[in-house]
């Protein structure tokens, strides 16, 4: 119902913008978005892609191999993050070869945490200041982004790779992100995401030997 309401409002806004506003050029976040809008609304104006560069500095990586962990940034109060984490908790985490610690950052109410029925070594840090968040970013093996819904470029993924942190995500969430640090499979199946995380853990943990 939440997504349906957003969908209806977004469609109404898009039609108004495209029909009433006279512009010389449309700028899109991803190639997929550009092609979709050109086809749906028969856009004849010039269309281009926005730069996906964020003004964030690389951080010094000091990976904690003694107590390794993965990082999932993003408040679960945001519907898309909750949906993705729920999928990860139920379908992905139980099938990993190594039961590794996972830290979820961002606002998280006790109600939402209980709804997730989290098992295993999955912990919630709550909201963090920049210094503490960057400490986790520096120490983690990498970022996991179990995102399966939403539109546009996923800022948390873009921010992570530009900080120099590897990210394992879904094919869906990788759209618009061109980085050697962004790892994903050929589809959005559970088995593919599980395989990508397992492969990443095997590669990364072997570096500590």
List each model region and its residues.
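Membrane-proximal helix-turn-helix segments that form the acceptor-binding/catalytic region
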Residues: 2-26
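Short alpha-helical segment that forms part of, or immediately flanks, the ligand-binding pocket
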Residues: 134, 155-162, 175-176
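Conserved catalytic-core segment of nucleotide-activated headgroup transferases in glycan assembly
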Residues: 28, 48-131, 138
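Helix-loop-beta element that forms the nucleotide-linked donor phosphate-binding surface
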Residues: 18-29, 34-54
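Conserved donor-nucleotide binding/catalytic region of nucleotide-linked donor-dependent transferases
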Residues: 198-209
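Acidic donor-binding loop of glycosyltransferase active sites
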Residues: 137-152, 163-165
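Short acidic alpha-helix that forms the nucleotide-activated donor recognition element
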Residues: 19, 129-141, 162
